[in-house]
Amino acid sequence: MTVETPPIPDDATPMMAQYLAIKRAHPDCLLFYRMGDFYELFFDDAVKASAALDIALTKRGKHAGEDIAMCGVPVRAYEAYLAKLVRSGFKVAIGEQMEDPAEAKKRGSKSVVARDVVRVITAGTLTEDTLLDARSHNYLAAVAEAQGTLGLAWVDVSTGDFAMQAIAPKTLAAALARLSPGELLVSDRLLGAADFFDVWADWKNVLSPLPTARFDSENSRRRLEALYGVGALDGFGAFSRAELAAGGALVDYVELTQKGKLPRLSLPKRLAEGAVMEIDAATRRNLELAETLSGERRGSLLATIDRTVTGAGARLLAAQLAAPLTDPHAIEWRLDMVGFFVEHESVRAQLRETLKRCPDVERALSRLSLGRGGPRDLANVRDALAEIPALRMLVTQSHLDTPPGINQCARELGEHSALVDRLQRALAPDLPLNARDGGFIAQGYHEGLDELKGLKTESNGLMMRLEKRYQDETGIASLKIRHNNIIGHHIEVPSKQADRLGEGYIHRQTMANAARYTTTELIELAGKITGAADRALALEMELLADLIGEVTARAAEIALAAAALAGLDCASALGEMASSARWSRPRVDDSTAFDIRGARHPVVEAALEAARSGPFVANDCDLADSQRLWLVTGPNMAGKSTFLRQNAVIAILAQMGSFVPAESVHMGVVDRLFSRVGAADDLARGRSTFMVEMVETAAILNQAGPRALVILDEIGRGTATFDGLSIAWAVVEHLHEVNRCRALFATHYHELTRLTSRLAALSCHMMRVKEWQGDVVFLHEVGAGAADRSYGIHVARLAGLPPAVVGRAEEVLGILEKSDQASGMARLADDLPLFAALAKPRPAATALPQASPLEEALKAVNPDDLTARQALDLVYELKRLL
């Protein structure tokens, strides 16, 4: 978003000329121009910011004969405003004062305080806790092209997590969906490539185009080698030219926005092709993995399974859910860790209580390495590292059969007692929010600082005694010695009593109801106090820099410990989830099995428990080679969509290394997961609901292979009946004959069940129901066979359609079912009376007879307390009473 910068006229004031020069160097940013205690914005920046922030727009002077628009935000509260601007899509350049106004005056009375941009804040380069979600990664990603291949690189500036991946063009969209970057860097040339138009459209709100020259692979290679101090990157992985181009552009952009500074970046990890399950954006959305269809975290799969107690653990859990593994050995490694915490409940409980006392080391370390950290970040590092001995002892007890993953975490926690001891001695108990406020070094840590603080305290006592003497000498009891940043220490008296002051009182300022003075004695004492305070703060800042230097010198070890803390938190949280929700350990191998017994949908089950609506009805699913394609029929509201989703969700949970909501699971690795469930249009691209459905179905048919898992719900429903049936028919055949993948296909087209005679691996299954005296009971059970009815009219009745409409629908359905559809339609048009003619008078109410045993039994029942099974049993009991 580039904002036009006005030219610098010859008659511009020195301050405005400085502002325009800085703004010209950052045309794509809103410029926060520091003026004392405020950041001011001018011209179009002010107009845009005032609208986005809902703050007053004023004016200051003129430029080219026009008023200069202006708005501002206080420095002490700027982060809240900054967060709102970044969320609105703006980049913000922070223009700070680089010297004290007193220093500027030494160059001349008209000299302007030197200012420069110290940082450019973008959505992908945030580090402040107030601007970030503690439980989510904030990725900055870059895409580059070289030799016909694509490279994807991503970094979380707030944690230093850095990785690269070579990808095929057709998998770019899925890779970006996995990362969900806060900002995406793309070259001008790649941005204009027609092949990626739809991909960029999905991420248009976070795109940051860069000149193509920034993505030079050779320059990027040298840049990365220099960053890590190595002669070659081969030791980190066999990176392609495209990966290097993306990674180098990423690092350059971070350094550019941080004005020459870089956070501590981890050694670049290389994600191998096919290392994680590929899940496209539509599938993630349909399965509500990280957020619901309404965009909320609550109600998503992630929110349901997240039992972590640290921010880093929550971020790791989210990353594992977003990228399920495809290597059975790696999956077993994680499952062993989770299983350890399921088995050892006491260890799990104690470890989780200890982890709750561990602050976010990763983000504190990143801020410290950028020179943006403060005393509280040091305290966060200290407090987390202080818990390491207790954590290590918990998981390495001699009687425990500790798995390799837990042992590795215990080793990587490291030894930090000397650093913890120094930080505990150095930092004061109560730490200020900002280092510039001082008072963060503990008493007794540094003798020289203690002396300066003592002098300051002694001077403050002298100031109080001086105030008392002045009150006694003048007889003005309300006389006060005060201080502000403009005139420093001064004597303040009510205006009506100012004439009682003697000749030694020097006038400084007249207010509405008070007058301000000083004396030679006060000036001397104030100088001592100010000098002592300034020297104390300067020394504290030196000591702070030393402490930060010691921490950053051990950054690699501390980062390793932070990752181990996150790993323990994530594994123990999944163990907590498995234990409390009665989940079982899945068996994942290289076969094509998909045998799930007693499966439940974790989100729906949790919602039922919260509402006390009865237990979730578990179901089996076995997509063996002989029946790898299930055709699922049954009425609306019977649970088809939930059944489809729960099997996909269980596959994701199993491959992320979690226990699963089922009695048992044996499944072969799923390399790609596709879900076409639900209905939504895409008005921004001019796509109807049916068009979106067809686009997503096309992606499935073109990409699914033998190891894929596909779930499809009601394909073809958005068009004419015969068109929809024909499409669904052809899709089933293609899945069976060409894709040859494991698939669940839910449909209301009962005609598709005839395909079982021709397709050997097609198996029919249905959602079971019970009919009783014109009513329908949904059992939510899956059984073999095909449903012959959809009970849509029954659902319409439950939804509250007027009885006359329901009656009319039943009459129409009866005619259609008694004849072929074409002739039935003709009869409907010719023979049925119009809707209005169907209204019949209701019979008059009659007196009720004496209650029968049947009625007494009904009165004793509360339907809200019945499960589906209990309701069915009750129906049979009531029938016996007739």
UniProtKB/Swiss-Prot annotation:
Keywords: ATP-binding, DNA damage, DNA repair, DNA-binding, Nucleotide-binding. Transmembrane segments: none annotated. It holds the Pfam family MutS_I. ATP binds at G634, P635, N636, M637, A638, G639, K640, S641. Signal peptide: none annotated. GO terms for cellular component: cytosol. GO terms for molecular function: ATP binding; ATP-dependent DNA damage sensor activity; damaged DNA binding; mismatched DNA binding. HAMAP family: MutS. This is DNA mismatch repair protein MutS. It comes from Paramagnetospirillum magneticum (strain ATCC 700264 / AMB-1).
